[in-house]
Amino acid sequence: MLLATASLKAADQPSLAERLGYKATDKLLIVNGDDAGMCHTANLATTECMEKGFMRCATIMTPCPWFPEIVSYAKSHPEKDFGVHLTHTSEWGKYRWGSVAPSDQVPGMLDKQGYLWPEVMDVYGHAKPEEALIEGRAQIKRALAAGIDVSHIDSHMGTMQMHPAFVKAYVQLAVEFDLPIRMASQETLSKMGHPELRGEISAKGILFPDYFVYEELKDEKKQDVKTFWLGVVRKLRPGVTELYIHAGTPSDELKAITGSWQTRSQEFEVFTNDEEMKSLIAEQKITPIGYRPLRDLQRKERQQAK
């Protein structure tokens, strides 16, 4: 019934693009930079892509050691759009981090060494959704206390987006802080057996892009990253689409942290310097946007609905 109501409401109101001030036929693209704050290289590449490329927003990992650096940039560039990359895992073998919340409040979130679990399934197997909620709230509050004008939230490695109980906590945070969220596509949710989620969340007044592109690079060392992303952008539909990248450069630091440094470096180049991508976006009349317009619209609409 809730889904049906949400569907009727969606059919009666203008599209998200129109509510943002565009035409229903316009193609709006959010290129979000995941993993800001993770390390120095990630910060440098993310900010350069925001300044020179098509990235219009990025999400920050508040538990990570290089969080203060990205905070400094965000505060000195208030026009830039930053959200929180809710981080409930610490996946790199030689570079780890713990929780923002006190460990006694989230014991199930931490391994024997006091770090966040390396895999999403570890989180589901050891932590309660309530602990994920506490940790997520602590991370958002940390960003706000640091002076970041938080525009949206998403989930590192999708931890808060792939299990119904954790999705509930994810949405609770969105409602509590009145923030738009990254949301899996309708096709993905249907495959997961939860086709109703988009309708239920929309009924709460929480906004999310019409479409979400999940990055499926099967072999990071051999996949043609540029061809992959050109294909994605070429197929964009009218409305608001989000895709995410992990911007990086081939630094010794990034090479020491992750085996995906090549993919991260290539994604940075494609969305910052690549002439073919620039031409394609111009030819397709695609408008890059960030999440801040969605946040402002959401807060306006939810206030009007009271």
List the model feature ranges, each with a label.
Residues 36, 63, 85-91, 156-158, ...:
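Active-site beta-loop-alpha junctions enriched in small/polar residues
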Residues 40-64:
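A short alpha/beta connector and helix-capping loop motif
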Residues 181-184, 257-306:
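C-terminal domain-boundary segment and adjacent tail
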